[in-house]
């Protein structure tokens, strides 16, 4: 299958990129810059991953999305949630932290942008980095979302593009394990909400990745602030 991969440079999208290569021809990796805090880090990580796998890479600029987003993922004056590891699976708390980093219709917008390229490049699928952990509080991370988006694209694309995530039913531990099997270059990824010199080790994205690595007895990538 020919595919376009949405690549943020983070854990989920990087593993999906690596897996998509085993399933067919990845014609393009797309990174979206919506002025998120970690934009420059995500773009750099995505570019390195695309270069590593010899895949064309393109950055799409969406500055207006930052203008209408009022949450901490974009607004530097807002405090990012820093849940403790033991709080990650508490749904009520997770729902609150999700609301603090929500971006309006983000994944809906992203998969449709990718579908434009997929149609033009004669690709059957758009690959996105979803996971079942965050699907509990982010409905646009669910298999149901992918199916609904695919259904709409039966009408909106000439070649009936579908949305697919190879990790949509996996938790972070399983995703890291899959990345290990695929020999993913962990040192190239960026899975932090912040855009500092090193991944902070405190935000929810970092916490979920740290828990996954520790549960598998793996050392964290060297670009973590909190390394063993």
UniProtKB/Swiss-Prot annotation:
For this UniProt entry, the molecular function terms from Gene Ontology, in alphabetical order, are: ATP binding; ligase activity, forming carbon-nitrogen bonds; zinc ion binding
Q: Which UniProt keywords apply?
A: ATP-binding, Ligase, Metal-binding, Nucleotide-binding, Queuosine biosynthesis, Zinc
The protein's required cofactor(s) are namely: Zn(2+)
Q: Which Gene3D superfamilies match?
A: HUPs (3.40.50.620)
Residues bound to Zn(2+): 192, 200, 203, 206
Spell out the CDD domains in the cross-references. QueC-like
Tell me the route in metabolism or biology where this protein functions.
Purine metabolism; 7-cyano-7-deazaguanine biosynthesis
Q: What reaction(s) does this enzyme catalyze?
A: 7-carboxy-7-deazaguanine + NH4(+) + ATP = 7-cyano-7-deazaguanine + ADP + phosphate + H2O + H(+)
What Pfam families would the database entry show? QueC
Query: Which GO terms of type biological process are on file?
Result: queuosine biosynthetic process
Superkingdom of origin: Bacteria
Q: Which residues form a coiled coil?
A: none
- Per the UniProt entry, the Enzyme Commission number(s) are 6.3.4.20
Q: Which InterPro entries would you find in this protein's record?
A: QueC, Rossmann-like_a/b/a_fold
Q: Where does ATP bind?
A: 7-17
* Cofactor remark: Binds 1 zinc ion per subunit.
> Could you give the subunit structure recorded for this chain?
Homodimer.
Q: Which family does it belong to?
A: Belongs to the QueC family.
NCBIfam families found in the cross-reference section: 7-cyano-7-deazaguanine synthase QueC
Q: Which HAMAP family match?
A: QueC (MF_01633)
Q: What does this protein do?
A: Catalyzes the ATP-dependent conversion of 7-carboxy-7-deazaguanine (CDG) to 7-cyano-7-deazaguanine (preQ(0)).
What's the protein here called?
A: 7-cyano-7-deazaguanine synthase
> What is the species listed in this Swiss-Prot or TrEMBL entry?
Desulforamulus reducens (strain ATCC BAA-1160 / DSM 100696 / MI-1)
